[in-house]
Amino acid sequence: MFPQNGAKVPEIRFNGFTHDWEQRKFSDIASRESISRESSYDLPSLEYEDVIAEEGRLNKDISLKENIKKGIVFDGSQVLYGKLRPYLHNWLNPDFSGVAVGDWWVLKPNNADKSFIYRLIQTQRFDDIANQSAGSKMPRADWNLVSNTEFAVPVSQEEQEKIGEYFSSLDHLITLHQRHTDFYKKTSCYFISS
């Protein structure tokens, strides 16, 4: 669904889209938010430990957290990318408001679809760039490098939306199947131990 090896279009594509994708700097399709504030009941804090790495899902109900922490405000219209140790693949596509505590980039889409940006930050190309980082013990992705890197982007926002929706549907199916698998494992263990 993303162009490979310098191609102008991906090998697999939705019907009705024929235009070449264009090369755009990341800073042209997403900008970093920087408004900081303390967390509260209405704006729960979100930390690295709250997100399942490589899955982009919360591992707890963060609205139940009581500690007050300062971080970057997000309102659900942005994508979160963990810049600390980018090889850990911490990312989140929130549909709620909160405060991103720690080393998160809060990425606001600029003339681009939020779900597409969320998928773009998971590509191998983005990962390769983000991991060209400074620091050996605590490497961090370099915004200057990432923001000035060009990525292939569909001209049509409708195509961006379809790509985002497609991968969101796949994630949903995977989660459902994982829940079923977990249920059957627990059931099996119960019967074996009985």
Residue ranges and their predicted role:
Residues M1-S194:
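Feature detects amphipathic, helix-rich regulatory segments
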